[in-house]
C-alpha cells in the first residue's frame, strides 16, 4: 500500500518477502440490499515501529492464522482484540516512490520502484553557449 509523508512524498509499503498482505476490513450491506447503502472500511491501528515516521497509522494486517479467525463470526472478541497488539514491523519494508502514484493517469509497474529524488534540486540546465 502507499502512504504519504509530508510534504507530498509517497512511500510504498510491502512485505519484505513480496508475499501478498491481508488487511482487516468491515463491510456493511443495508437490510434491503440497496447498492447505495453498502459501505466498507479498512481497519487501522497505530503504525509499527519505524513506520510511524511515514504515517501515524497503518492497516491491521492479518497473517494466515489470524485471517481465518477474523472471518469467523463466532470468534470471541478477546481473540480479535489480541490481533491488535503491537507488532515490531520486521516483516515490512517501505521506501519513497515517485509522486506519480498520486495520478490516476499513471498506471505502470515502475510506480513501486524506489525513488529517492524527492526534495532534491532539479539538475542545472547546461549552458547553451
Regions found by a protein language model. Name each.
Residues 1-129:
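A structured binding-face within diverse protein domains that lines the active/interaction site
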